[in-house]
From Swiss-Prot:
GO terms for biological process: proteolysis. SMART domains: ACR (SM00608), DISIN (SM00050). The lineage of its organism: Eukaryota, Metazoa, Chordata, Craniata, Vertebrata. This is Disintegrin and metalloproteinase domain-containing protein 29. SUPFAM superfamilies: Blood coagulation inhibitor (disintegrin), Metalloproteases ('zincins'), catalytic domain. Residues 712-763 are annotated as: Disordered.
Amino acid sequence: MNMIEALLSMRVLFLTQVFGIFLCFPGLTKAGHLHYHSSIEVVIPMKVTEKTRGMNLPNWISYSLKLGGQRYIIHMKIKNLFLTRHLPVFTYSDQDSLLEDYPFVQDDCYYQGYVEGDSESLVSLSSCFGGFHGLLEINNIVYEIMPKKFSRKFEHLVYKVDINKTESRGSSLMQDNITCQVELQKSGNPILKQSSFEDWWTHTKIVELVVVVDKTLYDHYGNYTVMLSDLYSVINIVDTIYEVIGIKILLVGVEVWNKKNLIVIDDVSKSLRLYCRWKASNFLHRLKHDVSHLFIYRHLRGLSGIGSTGGICDPKRSCAVVTFIDRTLNLRAIGVAHHLGHNLGMKHDEDICKCSYSKCIMHMDSPPIPKFSNCSYNYFWSYTVKNTRCLMENMYTKDIFDRTRCGNGVVEDKEQCDCGSLRNCTNDLCCMSNCTLSTGSSCAFGLCCKNCQFLPSGTLCRKRDNICDLPEWCNGTSHECPDDAYVEDGIPCGVSAYCYEKQCNDRNEHCRQIFGQNAKTASVHCYREINTKGDRFGHCGLQGPTYIKCKSNDALCGRIQCDNVVQIPNMKDHSTIHFALVKNVSCWGTDYHTGTSLTDIGDVKDGTECEQNHICINRHCVHISTLDSNCTPAFCNYRGICNNKHHCHCNFHWDPPNCMIRGHGGSVDSGLPPKTNKKKHFFYLLLLQLIILACLLSCLLWLLFNIKGSKRKPQVQPTPVKTKKVSKKVPSQKPSPVPSPSLPQLRMPSRSASPTSSIKSTN
């Protein structure tokens, strides 16, 4: 066997906006061991007892403290809307049994507020351990405050964050910057200012967050109570940061890996992939949530973490991994907020992105800045507001807060709706300020609610995304669209492709995505030769730092191998293209650097066919029967297709649940499509017949008119024309035979005949 290998390395600058929001690449940021604190002051917060201007509201407290020679008045109120009622905490026993507990959570020691005289200020503090700990932003200066240990005078240490140590580098491409600014301003979703951001929608969006603490972070704390308190403080700061853009962060559960890590945590991308997979198969069914973050205490090659971009409403991608090592409480919170921004569809800031600082929270350097840039607002508007249906649904989850209150923007017990503040309620035609529907209104929100009324039954509320997806329709009696349903795993979607997790994975299409439209999957010899080597170009996964060799039966489930590559693609972020010649067959593939932020495009996707009636799952070629299901084509009477909930989605003309009775299609999960109006169809059919009949009558009348007209015309006899006889002497000769005009002249084959002559004359 001849083998020729060529490594083609292409190094390019990683651009976070190459592929767009809907490709959902993970986002990474640099963490480093940066010392942001430039100065320390000792302050004593003094409680203000007199009611200052505008502070006559109940449940508000005020403190005065002196920073940098200037005294500031801080107004705060207790925050009680970021922890669920009866917060569950999961741990493990010595026998690896799952334990569920509901520890006491002190919920009256978390505050949010502002600094008097600074409308852009931000205050997020906690006082659960006898002093204030948290974040202050005053006049575009960020501080971290914490109690001074063993102080009897209520002294606190205030650290001023040195932002200059993270100054962004200037760009010489001024024209490109101007062009990009113009493009952003011309976009359909213009960049909006923070001051008017709250007016974009009526209701607040809620992100239900689950936090998992790995073994290293648990061991670092040692004290279980202090660890949970710090977690709550971090989420408190994150919630305060996101409240500016109309998002509430709700912590709905915590899991602590107190015995051992349940996944392998070595490189960044692999850890994220494994954690997302673990979360989807374990935690998702245990506790409903929108996004889950894994907090660890170890270095990630200079990164603060990694999060799946735009995965907020995808249960298999709504996750992130964040490191807490060598980071203060504020930096931990800002790191969580950064990667949550990726989950919400925000990309890394570029040089054109601006806020009140030189770098903003979504910058790749992960600066200690709690402000979003104009670009982040634009991404949030163009993606999150318009594409995150799950957040709209979670807004109205019942019984999730410690205290119910009309006016908090969340529909709770005994509330028909909640339009939030009085200002918002004046602009809401469906909901009144007392959390009841306005007169004549049937609903106030939801995908099946329009103009305060339920959409009619059969109205499409969620269209079909691809061949492996299924549509959903409103039922006419609810404001909610049915849960997203899709084609059952294992159902064929092509010649050699199967639906799996809502995607139709085909090898040829996979190669075209990497190497262009002419590419196709390579010979099986390429897979068996390369993927059984166990190197970075061919393997079946990683076990620590070692590549796993694919077994011969699993070779087609390792890394993708392609043929018929016409042009080498422009790979990103130091990716390498691999070429080999196996049995005179070209084999093209890629490697993957685990420290990059790009998705590994070279892995064979789960659900890809590897043999007849076999598919790849977790890099193993398994029989399709392993996808156990009670739903079969026979169960649906061969008149429908099974969905992911193992119910029949019937074809048109047949009704669920088993597609036996005549109807209009759909399923018990997705609702029923609109019914066909037989009277309307009959009318259209009758109209078509009348049009055809009218055309025939018109043609008949035209023929009759022409026939009568020809009979009425008089017969005119032609006048004979006198002609002179012309005599000409012609030498006598035998006349040539003239062919009959009624017979066709055939060209007869003749060996001596001229090519241009078909009849021969004789004298």
